[in-house]
Amino acid sequence: MKAYAFGFPKIGEKREFKKALEDFWKGKITEEQFEEEMNKLRMYMVENYRKNVDVIPSNELSYYDFVLDTAVMVGAVPERFGEYRGLSTYFDMARGGKALEMTKFFNTNYHYLVPEIETEEFYLLENKPLEDYLFFKSKGIETAPWVIGPFTFLYLSKRNGEWIRRPNQMEKLLESLVSVYKEVFEKLVENGCKEILVNEPAFVCDLEKAHWDLILNVYRELSEFPLTVFTYYDSVSDYEACVSLPVKRLHFDFVSNEENLKNLEKHGFPEDKKLVAGVINGRQPWKVDLRKVASLVEKLGASAISNSCPLFHLPVTLELENNLPGGLKEKLAFAKEKLEELKMLKDFLEGKTFDLPNVSFEDFAVDLQAVERVRNLPEDSFRREKEYTERDRIQRERLNLPLFPTTTIGSFPQTPEVRKMRSKYRKGEISKEEYEAFIKEQIKKAIELQEEIGLDVLVHGEFERTDMVEFFAEKLNGIATTQNGWVLSYGSRCYRPPIIYGTVTRPEPMTLKEITYAQSLTEKPVKGMLTGPVTIMSWSYYREDIPEREIAYQIALAINEEVKDLEEAGIKIVQIDEPAFREKAPIKKSKWPEYFEWAINAFNLAANARPETQIHAHMCYSDFNEIIEYIHQLEFDVISIEASRSKGEIISAFENFKGWIKQIGVGVWDIHSPAVPSINEMREIVERVLRVLPKELIWINPDCGLKTRNWDEVIPSLRNMVALAKEMREKFES
């Protein structure tokens, strides 16, 4: 029995990766010093592997993103970056003004840079797999280089702004791409490499027979090399085609669902290759029941075990956590502990005897009363009392807003002063009273500024919040937050996913104090600001023994209690942010109806407000076409969307959907850019939307929250936005 592992987090126990990378960007350290820091992290990762598994991956420490590394390897550097000059060009592609687009890696919370393919000829530009292999070999460590496979690389790429996913688009490009991979693999083998770990997660996507024909051709071309092909995040789309590939070993994910297992039982597994069973969950931080997993491995007849998917979706180690709720720590395993589980599982399968940990969750942190409430929800819990047209009439009378009402999405700049005061409060250097007085002062300034600029619907600014999910996690029962449970989101940006470990309930109001204070300062409506249940769940870890639907409904009920408290306090508009509504959808579209049924119900349960309360939803993605029918079923009154990058073209989704009657907040300002948008640029977007929607349905707002921007960018941009709204009103009212 062999133990494999892959995708160990590169960030270091104390985010050493982030510090070194940002210091290098700021010019505080030289390239040589940066490389030294990276080498320390490389050794740390490999030492953890060496203690626990048999096959040690190399080429796993990317300086920004492993898909970007692959693009550089095969010479896919867009012309606008000029001649490739090492790290300076590499980081220009990642984060300069001309940077590549960034999007989610499959349905995970990791973001990758989308390669832009401008040519049909690839060539070997930089052989990082070989460099890394030789780095470890020089230290006497034999490794197996980890690479993104050619099919997945192309599947994740775009040409002229469109995905390269149709078989006829891929065929010629794959031929050229494979020649580069051949060259890379030849050089590795020439230098003594005995195994190459090729990652092909795209094999689990909705692929046609023509795709599998291409994949078979690719791997016939590469059949002379010692390849282990890894698939993960779901079951492979065509099991029989996949197991027929001429490779030495195949890794399947047996954690995400049971389809790979069912296919293996039905069709068997070929004798000419070995099965690597992905049985230790790489996406959730729970300890496994090793006896149960061992019996699955035996049932599979696997000759090797591994994690189900990359471990970089987990924090580095549990060792630094000292403040978790009682009984929780012993039920958890982060990346380092998952490696230890693999070692323990291998030892157990080889007949070694020892006490296995008890990981029973049966009655852990369960609130039976709350569970029963969720299980017995009446059907009308998921529908508002009146239909939208009736609600709209009531709300227009109550709010009396002008045409083209203006608002922002919620957060205002978190200045160094705000962050410093929060840090002081958390360290106990200032009292709760001092901190709350400071927050009140920030809210007062924000309300005064919005009044002066002339916005129609105001926000309190969210100065008391670090993160839109962590803020609520800290206030809800059944959710724990960590001290050092950092996970990489993209580049050097890390976040700490909360852990949903028990029944989720709301012990007391979470946002009432700040929102009602803000409302007391103005006659204009101030929005209540809440994060939706699907996003709280999607950006957290959650129990595997409780159905996802049930967890989402528990959170939704807690959010709905907050909505009701805000209504009671006289708040007329409540916004529920659901950026994860689309991204949590399964990879395979055949599973969408089941997911969207409970995701829609969860939002509607949270949003079940009085008819006179205007519910806003905020979703910041750029492609609504695929999910417009599901969005239409959500019980909001206004939805705000990102429209600036597409110059308003996103509205085509609503144009093609017959019967759209709800209001839309059009994002006219790309908040990811420091540039102040001109009135002309904003007007162009609104005019595009007016070709589709009547003027009565249009709101004007930025794309997203303004937390990461500076006040000197925010104020002129908001002034331009309000000036545009006034201009549009005059045009239509004259």
Swiss-Prot record:
It holds the Pfam family Meth_synt_2. It comes from the Bacteria. Its cofactor is Zn(2+). The keyword Transmembrane does not apply. 5-methyltetrahydropteroyltri-L-glutamate binds at R15, E16, F17, K18, K104, R493, C494, W539, E583. The active site is at H672. The keyword Zinc applies. Binds 1 zinc ion per subunit. CDD domains: CIMS_C_terminal_like, CIMS_N_terminal_like. L-methionine binds at I409, G410, S411, E462, D577. It catalyses: 5-methyltetrahydropteroyltri-L-glutamate + L-homocysteine = tetrahydropteroyltri-L-glutamate + L-methionine. One of its GO terms (biological process) is 'de novo' L-methionine biosynthetic process. Pathway: Amino-acid biosynthesis; L-methionine biosynthesis via de novo pathway; L-methionine from L-homocysteine (MetE route): step 1/1. HAMAP family: Meth_synth. PANTHER family: 5-METHYLTETRAHYDROPTEROYLTRIGLUTAMATE--HOMOCYSTEINE METHYLTRANSFERASE. Catalyzes the transfer of a methyl group from 5-methyltetrahydrofolate to homocysteine resulting in methionine formation. Belongs to the vitamin-B12 independent methionine synthase family. This is 5-methyltetrahydropteroyltriglutamate--homocysteine methyltransferase.
